[in-house]
């Protein structure tokens, strides 16, 4: 009795709520063996054919590749993809892929060479000799992913299971109508599938291994039983046909009686599930050393003349496979990738086959029926009765339409497996699955944005905390510096005190101050006399240089004289004196030219180096500038405007001045000037002083005519130059 009870418990199966029984339509394609499809001339391999990020490219345009050669590198959840055949990489560019919107994803495009040459394959026939980590890494690097539809990387899934997995379930239910890829694979490759299951069991070391298969696959069941006849480590469980019994949570409940909690995974209750196609791919990767480059695809529907299951290379265009099956499209022909309940319609047929492509359905118009108009929900609760996840689809529908994301999340919309059972039974023809997919996408986008905002806030708070710490440390340093002087400051203070003490010690004789005594300045006087003697000696050593330096430019002297005259006139006006006689710019120019000629002649007579001859044209220009400056000073001082100069007379006078200057230069160059006698110069200076004194006396007796500041400035300039030259000549004569 105990044995019978144990046997009953061993083969016991459970049921799940909900579910539907749609027409199976599997007999169209499961009756013919697997066959190969001729190679397509061009393959398009998307870099992302799984859940996770795409891998890093390791080929470039123009490279020749072999079948099984890695096109990308896989790190973490980045699963590598491999070349489906030998050929040449002609492009790496975005291409439309297997997606309801045919989104463009980065793909490697290969032109096949028709040789279909493999890379060097190295199989591990004795896989038990390798470690668990090595087997998982090999499975990952050979590109094995879940072939049941999810596309989750198998290596990552095995690594995450760890030691907490007690039950390994092999999903062979294949519950969706029309699809027979797993059924045909189990009929033709049952031994290889069982070998792959044993590799997975060796990695996970579970207590039990269960194979769940629906009872509508008698040939596959018989083949598996034949292979497992002598096996005691693997149990085959035949379950009733019911859609969607192939769901991960539903099959787990059927075989173990355990329910996966809301928001959880099968691994949370010690269960890990793999598809039969995945087990076959694991066997080829580990034992045969072949990366996943092909998979079984069901070609079915009334629009194809030769339905069946084929080995389709990854990257093969859908059009190529359908044409091989005798595709006869109608006017409004649709092609569905996947089954009629969970699949999606392809916008065009140039998309490639990927790892999750298990079926290509090309139905006729009568087979699918005419599209029906969506009506309002009548709250019949048929969708709730059919839901295998125990959800309330009608409530989720209202929340999705009303953008009530919080309520949709509270009603566990994330647990929806998008099986389509609710839409199948809906009498109002509401596409509930489409609403749920859109709502889940919006919720995921909101959560992603909230996560980014939280990360940004955390970074900001960390920065603020760091700034506060730095500020506190800076204030602490300032306080410590204010309380106690720095070491170098103390050293400087100590050095200064030492110097003061040393000076005090050196002062042995005290300073005595006597009242009424005069200071002894003899040393200071002697130093001053020495500096004077040194200056005289230096001046005598360089008489010519001093002469050259001290000698002023007569042209500059004339300009300075004109400016001096203007300043003197302005000062007279400010002092309130009578306005001087208006300045005649023509006379000023003539006087400036004569003054320059006299100065030049005196320089030549003194024996100094001849100055550069004055250009008459430059003299005329300078005279014009002097006239303009004088006129401007007159206007600023507010004096009466002078009589406007006649330009013709000014030109004549300038020409006469230039002729006189040129004549004086020629005379100075033809005969050398006599050296100036200092005694004569002294006599002339005395006579000049006497004349000046006499003029002053006359000015005191009777009022003189107001002096012309211009003439006074010119005379002063000439006197300064003459005195300077006489002094230089006297020094030369004394030497």
From Swiss-Prot:
Residue runs in coiled coils: none
Enzyme Commission designation: 7.-.-.-
Superkingdom of origin: Bacteria
Primary location group: membrane
Cofactor info, note text: Binds 2 [4Fe-4S] clusters per subunit.
InterPro entries to which the protein is assigned, alphabetical: 4Fe4S_Fe-S-bd, 4Fe4S_Fe_S_CS, Ion_transpt_RnfC/RsxC, Nuo51_FMN-bd, Nuo51_FMN-bd_sf, RnfC_N, Soluble_ligand-bd
Keyword field contains Repeat: yes
Biological-process GO terms, alphabetical: electron transport chain
GO cellular component labels: plasma membrane
Every 4Fe-4S ferredoxin-type domain range: 368-397, 407-436
Subcellular location: Cell inner membrane
Chain segments carrying region Disordered: 562-713
Molecular function (Gene Ontology), one example: 4 iron, 4 sulfur cluster binding
Residues annotated to bind [4Fe-4S] cluster 1: 377, 380, 383, 426
Top EC category: translocase
Recorded topology in the membrane: Peripheral membrane protein
Keyword list, A-Z: 4Fe-4S, Cell inner membrane, Cell membrane, Electron transport, Iron, Iron-sulfur, Membrane, Metal-binding, Repeat, Translocase, Transport
Ligand binding ([4Fe-4S] cluster 2): 387, 416, 419, 422
Cofactor(s) needed for function: [4Fe-4S] cluster
Family: Belongs to the 4Fe4S bacterial-type ferredoxin family. RnfC subfamily.
Function, in words: Part of a membrane-bound complex that couples electron transfer with translocation of ions across the membrane. Required to maintain the reduced state of SoxR.
Subunit relationships: The complex is composed of six subunits: RsxA, RsxB, RsxC, RsxD, RsxE and RsxG.
The protein's name: Ion-translocating oxidoreductase complex subunit C
Organism: Salmonella newport (strain SL254)
Gene behind the chain: rsxC
């Amino acid at each position: 009795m105990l044995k019978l009870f144990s046997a009953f418990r061993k083969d016991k199966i459970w049921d799940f709520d909900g579910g539907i029984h749609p027409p199976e339509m599997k007999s169209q394609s499961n009756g013919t063996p697997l066959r190969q499809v001729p190679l397509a001339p061009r393959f398009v391999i998307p870099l992302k054919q799984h859940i996770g990020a795409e891998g890093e490219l390791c080929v470039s345009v123009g490279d020749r590749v072999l079948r099984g050669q890695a096109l990308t590198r896989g790190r973490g959840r980045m699963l590598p993809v491999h070349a489906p055949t030998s050929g040449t990489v002609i492009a790496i560019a975005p291409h439309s892929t297997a997606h309801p919107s045919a989104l463009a994803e980065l793909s490697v495009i290969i032109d096949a060479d028709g040789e279909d040459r493999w890379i060097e394959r190295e199989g591990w026939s004795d896989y038990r000799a390798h470690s668990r980590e090595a087997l998982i890494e090999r499975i990952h690097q050979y590109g094995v992913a879940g072939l049941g539809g999810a596309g989750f990387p198998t290596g990552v899934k095995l690594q995450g299971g760890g030691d907490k997995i007690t039950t390994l379930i092999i999903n062979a239910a294949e519950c969706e109508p029309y699809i027979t890829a797993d059924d045909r694979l189990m009929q033709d490759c049952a031994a290889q599938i069982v070998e792959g299951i044993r590799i997975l069991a060796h990695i996970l070391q579970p207590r039990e291994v269960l194979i769940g298969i629906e009872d509508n696959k008698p040939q596959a069941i018989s083949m598996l039983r034949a292979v497992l006849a002598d096996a005691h480590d693997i149990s085959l469980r035949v379950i009733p046909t019911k859609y969607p019994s192939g769901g991960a949570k539903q099959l787990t409940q059927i075989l173990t009686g355990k329910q996966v909690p809301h928001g959880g995974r099968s691994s949370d209750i010690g269960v890990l599930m793999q598809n039969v196609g995945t087990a076959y791919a694991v066997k080829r990767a580990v034992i045969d050393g072949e990366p996943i480059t092909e998979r079984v695809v069901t070609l079915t529907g009334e629009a194809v003349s030769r339905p069946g299951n084929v080995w389709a290379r990854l990257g093969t265009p859908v059009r190529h496979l359908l044409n091989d099956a005798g595709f006869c499209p109608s006017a409004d022909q649709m092609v569905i990738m996947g089954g009629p309940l969970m699949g999606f319609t392809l916008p065009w047929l140039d998309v490639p086959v990927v790892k999750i492509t298990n079926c290509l359905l090309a139905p006729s118009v009568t087979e699918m029926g005419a599209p029906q108009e969506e009506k309002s929900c009548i709250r019949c609760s048929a969708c709730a009765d059919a839901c295998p996840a125990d959800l309330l689809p009608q409530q989720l529908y209202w929340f999705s339409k009303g953008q009530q994301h919080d309520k949709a999340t509270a009603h566990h919309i994330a647990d929806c497996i998008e099986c389509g059972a609710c839409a199948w039974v809906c009498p109002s023809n509401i596409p509930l699955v489409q609403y749920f997919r859109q709502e889940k996408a919006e919720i995921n986008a909101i959560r992603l944005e909230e996560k980014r905002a939280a990360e940004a806030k955390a970074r900001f708070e960390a920065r603020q905390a760091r700034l506060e710490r730095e500020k506190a440390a800076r204030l602490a340093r300032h306080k410590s510096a204010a309380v106690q002087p720095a070491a170098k400051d103390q050293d400087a203070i100590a050095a200064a005190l030492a110097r003061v003490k040393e000076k005090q010690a050196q002062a042995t004789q005290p300073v005595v101050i006597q009242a009424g005594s005069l200071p002894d300045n003899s040393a200071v006087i002697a130093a001053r006399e020495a500096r004077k003697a040194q200056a005289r000696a230096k001046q005598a050593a360089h008489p010519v240089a001093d002469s050259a330096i001290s000698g002023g430019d007569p042209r500059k002297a004339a300009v300075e004289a004109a400016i001096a005259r203007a300043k003197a006139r302005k000062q007279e006006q400010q002092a309130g004196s009578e306005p001087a006689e208006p300045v005649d710019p023509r006379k000023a120019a003539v006087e400036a030219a004569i003054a320059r000629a006299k100065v030049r002649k005196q320089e030549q007579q003194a024996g100094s180096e001849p100055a550069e001859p004055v250009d008459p044209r430059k003299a005329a220009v300078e005279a014009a500038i002097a006239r303009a400056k004088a006129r401007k000073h007159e206007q600023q001082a507010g004096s009466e405007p002078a009589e406007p100069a006649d330009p013709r007379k000014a030109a004549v006078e300038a020409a006469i001045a230039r002729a006189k200057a040129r004549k004086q230069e020629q005379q100075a160059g033809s005969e050398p000037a006599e050296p100036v006698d200092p005694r004569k110069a002294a006599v002339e200076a005395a006579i000049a002083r006497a004349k000046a004194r006499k003029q002053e006396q006359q000015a005191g007796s009777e009022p003189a005519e107001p002096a012309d500041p211009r003439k006074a400035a010119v005379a002063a300039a000439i006197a300064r130059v003459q005195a300077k030259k006489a002094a230089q000549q006297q020094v030369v004569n004394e030497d």
